[in-house]
Regions:
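Polar, S/T/G-rich
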Residues: 1-141, 148, 199, 204-206, ...
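Surface-exposed, non-catalytic interaction/assembly patches
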Residues: 3-6, 11-12, 19-21, 121, ...
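Short linear interaction motifs
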Residues: 51-54, 118, 174-178, 249-259
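Active-site-proximal structural scaffolding
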Residues: 64, 126-130, 136-138, 145-148, ...
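Short loop/turn segments at secondary-structure transitions that flank enzyme active sites
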Residues: 77, 81, 143, 151, ...
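Active-site proximal loops enriched in glycine and acidic residues that flank catalytic Cys/His/Asp
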Residues: 122-126, 147-149, 156-158, 198-200, ...
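Hydrophobic residues embedded in beta-strands of well-ordered beta-sheets
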Residues: 150-153, 298-300
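Autoprocessing Asn-cyclization modules and mimics
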Residues: 231, 237-311
């Protein structure tokens, strides 16, 4: 039938083969796709992963496997993403800009070369809940989504400076006189080995498993294995880094502290890095408040009497 068909938003491929060459077997085809053209920052070169100058907040269309801009596309596209519910002004593009730069940084690939820290090479074939898709993207970038009251922003686990300091002088003092209460993670939750599932392009794009271990922790605590899926991962080095991040996080971040603050706590969003000076923990007095300043006599009035060291 000579009819012109229309296939909107579809990459269509037609192949004609002789069925006698395959006998009774069904012909299967695999394609290596680059994927979608995304909106990326106007000062960004996706080929070299370089950022030039200061970004003015505008975008340009380009192919990119940067995880941050793949997430931006999913959140703002009106056809298959959340664009009908979230506008461009509702998503913190400036936070994604910093996250995208962190993902593009070159790191050792484990085989003598370098590669971007995090890339996204995934395809979504089924309709899923928006939160599940958002969680997959954020887990790969080691970040979490946060609604700060105005926009959907993102907080990433990466090296950063502290934003505030807390001590006994700026927290709520309970009746027992211990403002900081500590707790620890269970030993069973501190995994020292992880099996990371990822897609191996050198093995027909089949699922492979990368085993990551901390031998010193295994010798000390015994073997404690968990499993994880590396979303959008087609690099063995990236899979290894994902497993190593999980192990180090669970082995090193074992302590949590609970305390109450006043109105100044409203300055924070989840994921902020803070510093705590606990007198009971340190065994010394570590902080206080200035009650008054007299510029004429050049004197300070403190909240308690202190003894200055002789030196």
């Amino acid at each position: 039938i000579d009819v012109k068909q229309c296939y909107p938003n579809t990459a269509l491929v037609g192949v004609q083969v002789d069925s006698e060459q395959f006998g009774s077997q069904q012909v299967s085809r695999n394609y290596h796709l680059r994927g979608r053209i995304l909106q990326v920052p106007s000062n960004y070169n996706p080929q070299t992963r370089q950022y030039s100058g200061i970004w003015d907040g505008t975008f340009k269309p380009a192919y990119s496997n940067n995880m941050a801009w793949c997430l931006w596309d999913m959140l703002t596209h009106p056809r298959y993403g959340m664009g009908k519910r979230l506008g461009a002004a509702d998503v913190d593009k400036w936070a994604l800009y910093v996250i995208g730069q962190y993902c593009d940084q070159s790191v050792p690939d484990g085989f003598g070369g370098t590669e971007p820290r995090i890339t996204c090479n995934a395809y979504l074939t089924t309709q899923r809940k928006a939160w599940d898709v958002l969680s997959d993207f954020c887990s790969a970038m080691r970040c979490m989504p946060v609604w700060n009251g105005q926009t959907l922003t993102f907080v990433q686990d990466r090296p950063s400076d502290k934003v505030w300091t807390y001590n006994r002088s700026n927290v709520v003092m309970p009746d027992d006189g211990a403002p900081f209460r500590y707790s620890f993670s269970a030993l069973k939750d501190r995994h020292n080995a992880v099996e990371v599932n990822w897609i191996d392009p050198n093995n027909g794009w089949e699922t492979a498993t990368e085993l990551v271990e901390d031998t010193q922790a295994i010798a000390r605590y015994g073997r404690n294995v968990t499993k994880m899926d590396a979303f959008g991962c087609t690099s063995r080095g990236q899979a290894h880094r994902a497993g190593l991040w999980l192990i180090k996080t669970e082995l090193l971040e074992t302590q949590t502290v609970d305390f109450s603050v006043g109105a100044e706590g409203l300055r924070h969003v989840p994921g902020d890095v803070i510093e705590i000076f606990d007198d009971d923990y340190a065994g010394i007095s570590t902080g206080g408040r200035v009650l008054a300043v007299n510029s004429q006599t050049r004197t300070l009035t403190l909240d308690r009497e202190i003894t200055l060291p002789s030196s």
